[in-house]
Design a protein with these regions (language model features):
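Pocket-lining segment of extracytoplasmic ligand-binding domains
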Residues: 102-104, 111-114, 120, 141, ...
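Segments of small-molecule ligand-sensing domains
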Residues: 257, 261-336
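Short, solvent-exposed loop/turn segments at the edges of secondary structure
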Residues: 128-132, 266-267
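Divalent cation-coordinating acidic motifs and surrounding scaffolds
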Residues: 79-82, 86-97
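Immediate post-signal peptide segment of exported/extracytoplasmic ligand-binding proteins
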Residues: 28-47, 118, 142-153, 322, ...
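Short, low-complexity disordered leader/linker segments with a strong preference
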Residues: 1-43, 336
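Sec-exported extracytoplasmic/periplasmic mature domains
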Residues: 63-71, 91-95, 110, 172-176, ...
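Bilobed "Venus flytrap"/periplasmic-binding protein-like clamshell domains
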Residues: 43-69, 73-77, 131-200, 314, ...
Length: 336
């Protein structure tokens, strides 16, 4: 009887050992072994923006070029609320790579604006392209100046986006506050939703901070006449003086259908940021491909043509990742 019990125990132990061995082998093929761990580390999530904006399709073009030029990585693009949300995703480790406006990144690092505390788990790689503030109204609207937006229904950008942050700063410079005084009716719509609402006459104005020309605005002009609001007067000079990361920009006449005059506005650089703990060699490769394969990126999205190594650190105020810094050192570019 005792012998039978011992045999049963031995058989159970052997069976459990066999199950554990198979489990370990199975897990090893999915990432617990040396090769599996490396594969897991190279699965990268790239936070971008709304599907109707610039970040998402541009991010897709960049990811495609990374995947085809850097062995062993797989970058997956994810739509998001853009800059503010993207930096929070990096900080929490829920994304590995992200696009964000440099002014929003500056706020995040310092714990200002929409960030109640500093975010530290992200580092800069470099500037990708300039985003341009583009404020539109209907062609037959009686809104002629920024101040005329008082009491109007205005799409200010998605919650958690660089568009909303920048729009709020600009409107405040012209004496309009929609977060406390409710000087106007803000609509926190995605670009796609804002386009539809504007076409249907439910919005008085739409503010975009996008590359020029913006597909969202081009979409509107196919069915509706528009007019741009220029940034003018002493408020404009004060805006630039108090916000050094904003730079003067002029949208050339003829950029959009029915736009017969240049538009005076501002631009803000959009840059690539990564998790602070990404390996140096990986970020070096990502940086190298970003700036040396811009023509390939441009085949997927026209903004690729604006990627410029000589402007890679323009407006970058947050720490640069060591992997990117290594690449810049090789190219003779000094860190800010």
């Amino acid at each position: 009887m005792e012998m039978a019990k011992k045999k049963a125990v031995a058989l159970v132990a052997a069976f459990l050992a066999l199950v554990m061995a198979f489990a370990a082998a199975g897990c090893g093929t999915k990432g617990t072994g040396k090769d599996g761990a490396a594969a897991k580390k190279n699965e990268l999530l790239f936070a971008t923006g709304g599907t109707a904006g610039t970040y998402y399709p541009l991010g897709g073009a960049i990811a495609k070029v990374w995947n085809s030029n850097i062995p062993g990585i797989n970058v997956t693009v994810q739509s998001s609320g853009a800059s503010v949300e993207n930096l929070r995703l990096l900080d929490k480790g829920d994304a590995d790579l992200a696009l964000a406006m440099t002014n929003v990144a500056d706020d995040a690092f310092k714990g200002k604006g929409q960030f109640s505390a500093p975010l530290k788990n992200f580092k800069a790689v470099g500037v990708v392209y300039p985003d341009v503030v583009q404020a539109i109204v209907a062609a037959d609207s009686n809104i002629k100046t920024i101040q005329d937006l008082k009491g109007k229904k205005v799409a200010v950008g998605p919650t958690g986006s660089g568009t909303e942050v920048t729009t709020r700063i600009i409107l405040a410079a012209y004496g309009l506050n929609y977060t406390e005084r409710k000087d106007l009716q803000p609509v926190y719509a995605t670009y796609a939703d804002a386009v539809d609402q504007f076409k249907d006459g439910h919005l008085d104005s739409v503010w975009n901070v996008l590359a020029v020309p913006a597909a969202a605005i081009q979409d509107i002009t196919t069915t509706k006449g528009i007019r741009f609001l220029s940034l003018e007067g002493p408020e404009y000079e004060k805006l630039l003086a108090e916000n050094p990361l904003l730079v003067p920009y002029e949208i050339p006449a003829g950029t959009y259908k029915g736009q017969d005059k240049p538009v005076k506005t501002v631009a803000i650089n959009s840059a690539l940021y990564v998790r602070a703990d990404l390996p140096e060699d990986l970020v070096y490769q990502l940086t190298k491909v970003l700036y040396e394969k811009k023509d390939e990126i441009a085949q997927g999205h026209d903004r690729g043509r604006q990627i410029d190594l000589q402007k890679a650190l323009a407006g970058i105020t947050t720490p640069v990742h060591p992997g990117a810094a290594k690449y810049y050192a090789e190219k003779g570019i000094k860190l800010p």
